[in-house]
């Protein structure tokens, strides 16, 4: 007799929906897994799948601070942060991060996803025109939808198209990433600010992939460009360079007084716990003094970008994120397998993170990579580029 629990049949429309996903996303692949699921890296492989750009996830100072805080904090408040907005309850880390980035206030959130949705839901009245770079993170698109605003995409980093969109639809909100998470390009923030000023638009910059890596002491690209007084709002994920979890929304003090009581992600999520905040505080301390790691990160990234371009790849990256543009899903699967057989592991980006037949394999460089690692990656990529059955944009 089987011990397998009996389940009632699903409604046919649900069954059909799930069957469609299984066939469309899984069963058509050679390994009968989703395209993002290749081999498991073995010892000695070069793995470029993590956003831990400064290699802090194994930092002993940070781990010890977190461990001590877990033992010390026995007064955890497992509730929504909406109840913790008085001055005595707000974590000092919010003030520290605001001063670090150069903004008036900071609010922690559960994730970068929650930060972007909560911010746009708060600042956008229904039907507000929101001008969004085509490559901006999906959480910004979802924030527009949650706000009931109107998305007006503009071509990637194309200021002429942005101008035409604003002239056609009027004053609104411009949202961009500082460093784009798919192909590693950098937003022309000065030009975007000038456009926002000319047309009286609010400006939101997601610094998830530049906070900690760019700017003085890692304080971000906005601060590096001396635009903190011109950019209205900054959002970040603290699951990248901060190598943990949570997000943050930075802006004027008026935002901090209102968003916790308006934004659904803030109201209907539990607060970040005290021991987690201790870890984030220690991480910020380490990041501030990590100029050597930032120098090494950009050195390795430049080595990889230069080497790939010399091979013949079309590389658009200007940062520590480097993408091989592989096109179709079948070709991407073949490229992934080819590289992984040679102990080179990137992260596959496919729909819905990219457009159909616009798949990429993303290499996220980290500060602990060596010149030997880069040489190994370039050797494998040279072989892939010359392979008659593999295609690249």
Curated annotation (Swiss-Prot):
Its EC number is 2.3.-.-. Gene3D superfamilies: Aspartate Aminotransferase, domain 1, Type I PLP-dependent aspartate aminotransferase-like (Major domain). PANTHER family: 8-AMINO-7-OXONONANOATE SYNTHASE, CLASS II AMINOTRANSFERASE/8-AMINO-7-OXONONANOATE SYNTHASE. It holds the Pfam family Aminotran_1_2. It comes from Vibrio campbellii (strain ATCC BAA-1116). This is CAI-1 autoinducer synthase. Keywords: Acyltransferase, Aminotransferase, Pyridoxal phosphate, Transferase. GO terms for molecular function: 8-amino-7-oxononanoate synthase activity; pyridoxal phosphate binding; transaminase activity. InterPro entries: Aminotransferase_I/II_large, AON_synthase_class-II, PyrdxlP-dep_Trfase, PyrdxlP-dep_Trfase_major, PyrdxlP-dep_Trfase_small. Its cofactor is pyridoxal 5'-phosphate. Transmembrane segments: none annotated. GO terms for biological process: biotin biosynthetic process. Belongs to the class-II pyridoxal-phosphate-dependent aminotransferase family. Required for the synthesis of the quorum-sensing autoinducer CAI-1 ((S)-3-hydroxytridecan-4-one) which probably functions as an intragenus signal. The modification N6-(pyridoxal phosphate)lysine is found at residue 240.
